[in-house]
Swiss-Prot record:
Entries under Pfam families matching the protein: Macro
NCBIfam families assigned to the protein according to its UniProt record, in alphabetical order: PRK00431.1-4, PRK00431.1-6
Source organism: Listeria monocytogenes serovar 1/2a (strain ATCC BAA-679 / EGD-e)
UniProt superkingdom: Bacteria
Residue ranges occupied by any Macro domain in the UniProt entry: 1-175
Name of the molecule in the record: Macro domain-containing protein lmo2759
Cited Gene3D superfamilies: Leucine Aminopeptidase, subunit E, domain 1 (3.40.220.10)
Length: 176
């Protein structure tokens, strides 16, 4: 399994599934969520509304999968990251859960490639370095435990230079 880091637009990734940094209502919004909803087209919002009508809401740390509308990917996994408060409200555990559950959903559909944004580091205010550490640690731990998986590539798509530098530095460190 390969873990790669790129700078780019998550909506343009040619992978089986992209992960959306979603809100609990799955209704689109700003940042990554808004960009994905806009690029995927109106059918995505309809499908998300059907999911919410069925489950009520998607709390922080959880994830659901939908089709990808007009995107190059086949599926979108909507992972709801935590809003950063002070680090004393299970924020890191909820963030780790987003990555773990997204990988489980992708593997459950026998997908081979998944692209993640930097979940919760925008308007949700999660410290970027800590978020990168949690993300890299979690996907590595998942890969160790799920070594017999269909997933061959886990890609982190960094929108900004700061996250790109953090991920590139951390991927080669012993910290994660």
């Amino acid at each position: 399994m390969e873990i790669t880091i790129v700078k780019g637009d998550i909506t343009e990734q040619e992978v089986d599934v992209i992960v959306n940094a979603a809100n609990s209502g799955l209704l689109g919004g700003g940042g990554v969520d808004g960009a994905i909803h806009q690029a995927a087209g109106p059918d995505l919002l309809k499908e998300c509304q059907e999911v919410i009508n069925r489950i009520g809401s998607c709390p922080a740390g959880e994830a659901v999968i939908t089709s990808a509308g007009d995107l190059k990917a086949t599926y979108i996994i909507h992972a709801v990251g935590p809003i950063w408060k002070d680090g004393e409200h299970q924020e890191a555990n909820k963030l780790a859960s987003c990555y773990w559950k997204a990988l489980d959903l992708a593997a459950g559909k026998d997908l081979t490639s998944i692209a993640f944004p930097n979940i919760s580091t925008g308007v949700y205010g999660f410290p970027k370095k800590l978020a990168a550490e949690v993300a890299l640690y979690t996907v590595r731990k998942w890969a160790e435990e799920e070594y017999d998986t269909s997933i061959k590539e886990i890609r982190f798509v960094c929108f900004d230079e700061e996250n790109l530098k953090l991920y590139n530095k951390l991927i080669n460190s012993e910290v994660v």
